[in-house]
Amino acid sequence: MEIRGHQYTSAQGIATVSNTTPVEIIAGVAGKTLYLNYISISISDAAAASGELTDGSGGTAFWKQELIATGLEGPTSMMLNYGEYGLALTEDNGLFGTTTDAGLDYTVTALGYYK
């Protein structure tokens, strides 16, 4: 990936999150910072629960969505766009997803780069 004339290693991941145990979406790399450019979230099965994307396993949640099962009609999706430079996670950390209830299923597709 090229940003303003500099080459960086691209990072991408896709994972289904359906558990309270953190699921790794993009692995962290020792000594590198993961910058996230785009994240697509597709919610296919909802329960009254929250979904979170975190900076590392058990780290700080930078995206959290509470869902109420009643009133959710069919699948829903969200797109997070952090632009050309991206959202920086903590050095060495990867992108993880979790839920507060095993009844909530969502799929995350994420694109970024390591610097």
Q: What are the roles of these predicted feature ranges?
A:
Residues 11-13, 62-71:
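Solvent-exposed serine/threonine-rich low-complexity stretches and specific carbohydrate-binding patches
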Residues 45-65:
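Short, surface-exposed beta-strand/strand-loop-strand elements in extracellular ectodomains
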Residues 52-56, 94-99:
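Short conserved beta-strand and strand-loop elements enriched in small hydrophobics
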Residues 1-34, 38, 92, 98-115:
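C-terminal interaction-tip segments
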Residues 71-94, 100:
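Beta-sandwich interaction modules
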